[in-house]
Swiss-Prot record:
Name of the protein in its database record: Maturation protein A2
Gene from which the chain derives: A
RNA-binding: region residues: 159-177, 227-237, 295-299
InterPro entries: A_protein (IPR005563)
Domain of life the protein comes from: Viruses
One GO cellular component term noted in the UniProt record for this chain: virion component
Annotated family: Belongs to the Leviviricetes maturation protein family.
Role, per record: Induces host cell lysis. Inhibits host MurA activity thereby blocking the synthesis of murein precursors necessary for the host cell wall biosynthesis. May be responsible for the attachment to the host pilus.
A GO BP entry: killing of cells of another organism
Lineage: Viruses, Riboviria, Orthornavirae, Lenarviricota, Leviviricetes
Coiled coil: none
Subcellular location: Virion
Length: 421
């Protein structure tokens, strides 16, 4: 019998199958091979030429998985998701070629070219962006586009607001048609009880953002629900979302071969998190259950998920949208209590990795800046992909940064509104 590559096995009819135990739970191996043990530097200092080398004193240790082969699954024709990781103790960088030039006077002039110089930084691999991914899963697999519980809860105020908009629009059209600028001014002044003040612009912005825009979205969502074709064909689909954020690493105290010459700078890396699943639609509806989608048939549980009283209560709480800027309460309530499409997740993965975005290098010679040109490449990065059949779950987190210019404008409008009072 021929020997198969790692992670493959023979089936009962001698067909070649994937060994899922090996693919999903592989054993690690430690890689500590030395790369680029030496670096070279050549050039001149003070008129003296030299050609020398130095030792890259880097301790390299990577915990990684061995290469595994896969074959497509007969029932779907898709290759299975596998667990793979490449986990170094630190990020390893290489300067393929760098040139340092200076002329500080008093005979202190130099022109040096370095090749294959290595340095390392701590690996910022403890990150998880599930809170950014979870809302996108909630939206993608929600049974309905519209939030009917919230629409019902806000129904009375919505009708009053809609009637007010129609009256204002009718009066404004009449004023423009008849060239009545004074009448149009009165309509605008009605936002602030007769006099135009700076706060009026803020009132108009808030009314547009949290009155008119959600109303149009609700109308569109209801229409989408009515027009949706409920496709329950038993075929596999794929879905994935990702999120990335920049992270800055400082470089300092690097002395490549020469005394009184120091390298420093900053490297920007991007930490990325992606979550993907392979699934099939099933009949019925479901709810969220600790990272999984659980089918539901009990009418009381279905009614509770349809109305989602927790989300309704939160949406009707004054200024809850401001809390959601900083604490993801709304995302958690929406994910855990809403009504989902019933799907069967047959395969999936979550992947975290680090990529280099940009680098800036600076040189210092005897306390004086030195012109440095060259490139940097990432030799050992971080990569972790693990098999899963769950979906990302939102957990309580605090975010003190404004995520968009709209939040800044909302804040200015609210502040001017409070000052006016």
């Amino acid at each position: 019998m021929p020997r198969l590559p790692r992670a493959l096995r023979f089936g009962p009819n001698m067909e070649v199958l994937s060994d899922f135990q090996e693919l999903w739970y592989p054993e690690s191996i430690i890689d500590s091979d030395v790369k680029y043990p030496l670096y070279t530097f050549r050039g001149s200092i003070g008129g003296s030429f030299f050609d020398s080398y130095g030792t890259n004193n880097i301790v390299r240790e990577i915990r990684r998985t061995p290469h595994c082969a896969t074959v497509p699954i007969a029932s779907s024709g898709l290759r299975p998701c596998t667990s793979v990781w490449y986990d170094p103790t630190s990020l390893l960088f290489r300067i393929p070629e760098m040139r340092a030039e200076w002329d500080n006077g008093m005979g202190d002039a130099g022109d040096i070219v370095y090749k294959d110089f290595l340095f390392s930084t701590p690996a910022p691999k403890e990150f998880d962006f599930s809170n950014s991914l979870a809302p996108r899963y909630s939206n993608a697999f929600s049974a309905f586009n519209a939030k009917y519980g919230v629409i019902i809860g806000e129904g009375h105020e919505t009708l009053k607001y809609f009637a007010l908009l129609l009256r204002r629009l009718h009066k404004a059209v009449r004023a423009v048609r008849h060239g009545d600028l004074r009448g149009l001014r009165k309509i605008l002044d009605s936002y602030n009880k007769g006099r135009w003040k700076p706060a009026t612009a803020g009132n108009l912005w808030l009314e547009f953002r949290y009155g008119l825009t959600p109303l149009f979205h609700d109308i569109k969502s209801v229409m989408d629900d009515w027009n949706r074709i409920n496709d329950k064909i038993q075929k596999l689909r794929r879905f994935s979302v990702g999120h990335g954020e920049d992270f800055k690493l400082s470089i300092d105290g690097l002395y490549p071969g020469l005394t009184h010459f120091r390298l420093s700078g900053e490297i920007t890396v991007q930490r990325r998190h992606r979550w993907g699943i392979t699934y099939a639609n099933r009949e019925g509806y479901a709810t969220f259950d600790n990272g999984s989608i659980r089918p539901v048939s009990d009418w009381k549980e279905l009614a509770n998920a349809f109305i989602n009283p927790g989300e309704v209560a939160w949406e009707l709480t004054p200024y809850s949208f401001i809390v959601d800027w900083f604490i993801n309460v709304g995302d958690i309530i929406e994910q855990q209590k809403q009504w989902y499409q019933n799907i069967d997740i047959v395969d999936g993965y979550q992947r975290r990795d680090i990529r280099m975005r940009s680098v800036s290098l600076k040189g210092v010679r005897n306390g004086i800046p030195v012109r440095v040109t060259g490139s940097v490449e990432l030799v050992d990065s971080f990569y972790n992909r693990s098999h899963t059949t769950r979906i990302p779950q939102a957990t309580l987190a605090i975010d003190t940064s404004f995520s968009s210019i709209k939040h800044v404008m909302d804040s200015i409008s609210l502040i001017t509104q409070r000052i006016k009072r």
